[in-house]
Every structure is written in C-alpha cells, then in structure tokens.
A protein has these predicted regions:
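Binding-site signature for planar aromatic cofactors or substrates
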Residues: 1-163
Length: 163
C-alpha cells in the first residue's frame, strides 16, 4: 500500500462520472506509479482540514500516462490542470483513475488546519535543474530517484521526456 500526498489542488480534475485524473510531478519517489503498474489499483483520499470533518475515498483502477506518451498533451489540455507552479519539464505523468467505488467517512481524526497557500519549492527546484543542465538534468534525476519503488517495483525508466 502507498500513501503519498499529492497536489496542489489544481492538479486533480474530474473528467466524467467515473474518471478522475491528476498531474503527477517529478518527486523524490514513484510509489504510486510503481504500485499502479504492479496491480492497477489505486485509492485517492481527500480530507477536509476546514469545515465539517469528512474523508472521501475514490477507489478504482489506475493508468499511468507518462509525459512522453502521445496521449499526454491532449489529456493535459482536456483536464485543464491549474497548477500554480507547473513547470513543464517537471511533469512526470498523468494518473487516470477509473473510479469503481466512492466511500466517505467521518474525519474526526483529521486535524483542523488553516490553508496558507501553495509551496513554491517545486517550481524553484525544477527551474534550478533546468538552469544547471536543462531537461537532461531532470531526466537524470528521474532515472536515479524514480526508476523503482522502495520495494523494487519498476516505476519510471528515465522518463519523462517532456512533451
């Protein structure tokens, strides 16, 4: 099982009655991608940190659309992602979820938090990598850090080639 935070908020989109997608950015690991590729299962969990205590889970089958896949650009446009710090070279994949079950529960264990804003760190990191070595620098990072999961499942092999 994998539990990985995702975001920012503009990177998750509902595409139709049974499909959601989120923009997967380069990161320090690739657990979600590796586990989808292993068994196809995914659960997206959304928690309310303000207002009524609620948790929503979207259970389904996932598909990884890497940035170098011919479907990526069309799907990116269709989804209308609005990432405040979206650096094209750091787009790793789009995760499509065919939602087969929706469940909700109380969020009594979720702490109350006040939203302060998005963190600018991803944009700064990607821009620095681009200045130092361009897309090749990001691809080298992905090859080193994202080739496999912590339990040795294959994830990315040098992807993404920016679209």
């Amino acid at each position: 099982m994998n539990v990985s935070p995702k975001g920012p908020i503009g990177t998750l989109r509902v595409l139709d009655d049974h499909t959601v997608a989120y923009l997967d950015m380069v990161g320090s690991g690739a657990e979600t991608v590796a586990h989808i590729r292993e068994n196809g299962r995914i659960v997206v969990m959304l928690c309310a940190f303000e207002g009524p205590p609620r948790i929503l889970r979207l259970h389904g089958r996932g598909e990884v659309i890497p940035a170098d896949d011919e479907r990526f650009d069309e799907l990116y446009e269709r989804a209308g992602f609005e990432a405040p710090h979206d650096v094209e070279a750091a787009r790793r994949a789009i995760i499509l979820v065919d939602v087969t079950r929706v469940s909700d529960s109380c969020g009594y264990g979720v702490p109350l938090m006040t939203y302060e804003g998005e963190r600018p760190h991803m944009e700064a990191w990607a821009e620095k990598k681009m200045r130092v070595g361009g897309e090749a620098e990001i691809e080298a990072y992905v090859a080193k850090k994202n080739a496999e999961s912590i339990d040795d499942l294959p994830a990315f092999e040098g992807e993404p080639a920016s679209s």
